[in-house]
A protein has these predicted regions:
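Nucleotide/pyrophosphate-binding catalytic subdomain
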Residues: 1-209, 216, 220-222, 229-231
C-alpha cells in the first residue's frame, strides 16, 4: 500500500502558518514545509493505516518512503517550456524492494508514505500515484489498484456515471489530447501505462469510498471502476 495525504498536509501547513503554493498543479515544497509533509505522511497517516489494518485482523508494517524510494528533483515544464523549480519535490528513480519482499514473504502488508530520499540525502515530497506505479514496476505484481474519491476515469468529469470501464493503453494519448485525461489524472494514468509496459497485467482505478469496490472490480465481469491493460 502506498498512501497519500494531500488534504491533511494542507491543513497542517495552514496550522503551522506556512503558505501552500502550487505550480502547474504541483505543491511547491520548501525545506520548512517538507518537515511538515514527512511528519503528516510518515508519522501520522501511515501509523493510522497500519493500525486499522492490524485491528481488522490483517498484518501490516509501516515504512517512511525515505526508506523505500530514491529520487531526483522533479522539474515540470512551465507554460513557456522552461523547467519549473518547485523545491523538494522528487521523481522516484529507484525502489528498495528488499524490505517489501521480506514483508510479503511473511504475509505482512507494507504501508509506505510517498516521500523519498534524494541523491543529496534530503527528504523529498513525491506524487503518491507515481510512487505506487514505480513500486509496481519494481515488484511486478499482476495487479495495481489506485483507490481515490472518484468512481474511476470519467469520459465527462462532471458526470460520475460516465466511467470508462476498460481502456487499452493505445487509446490513452487520444483521451489526453481530447481533454478527458487532464490535471491530476495525467500522472495517475501515465504511471498505470508505465506499470503495464513493465509487465503488470492490469491496472484498476476504483472509488475507495464504495464498499467492496476492490472485490467487485476484480471479481465481477462488469466491474465498478476503470481497468487499464495492454489491449
Amino acid at each position: 500500500v502506498v498512501h497519500g495525504g494531500g488534504r491533511a498536509i494542507t491543513r497542517a501547513l495552514n496550522q503551522a502558518g506556512i503558505e501552500t503554493r502550487f505550480e502547474q498543479g504541483y505543491r511547491v515544497t520548501t525545506p520548512k514545509s517538507v518537515e511538515v509533509v514527512e511528519q503528516v505522511l510518515s508519522r501520522e497517516i501511515n501509523p493510522g493505516i497500519v493500525g486499522m489494518i492490524n485491528e481488522l485482523g490483517g498484518k501490516a508494517r509501516g515504512f517512511s518512503g525515505t526508506e523505500i524510494f530514491h529520487c531526483k528533483p522533479f522539474r515540470p515544464l512551465g507554460q513557456t517550456g522552461e523547467p519549473l523549480d518547485i523545491g523538494l519535490v522528487g521523481e522516484v528513480t529507484g525502489v528498495n524492494t528488499a524490505p517489501l519482499l521480506e514483508c510479503i514473504a511473511q504475509d505482512i502488508t507494507p504501508v509506505i508514505s510517498p516521500t523519498a530520499t534524494g541523491e543529496d540525502g534530503q527528504v523529498y515530497n513525491c506524487n503518491a500515484d507515481v510512487a505506487a506505479g514505480q513500486a509496481a514496476v519494481a515488484l511486478r505484481p499482476k495487479r495495481l489498484v489506485y483507490m481515490s474519491d472518484v468512481p474511476g476515469l470519467l469520459q465527462n468529469p462532471d458526470d460520475p456515471a460516465s466511467v470508462i470501464s476498460h481502456l487499452p493503453v493505445a487509446e490513452v494519448e487520444a483521451l489526453k489530447a481530447g481533454g478527458v485525461i487532464s490535471k491530476g489524472m495525467i500522472p495517475k494514468v501515465d504511471s498505470a501505462v508505465t506499470a503495464v509496459a513493465a509487465g503488470v497485467e492490469k491496472v484498476f482505478f476504483i472509488d475507495g469510498r464504495f464498499s467492496h469496490s476492490l472485490l467487485l472490480e476484480i471479481f465481477t465481469d462488469a466491474g465498478v471502476g476503470t481497468e487499464i491493460a495492454e489491449k
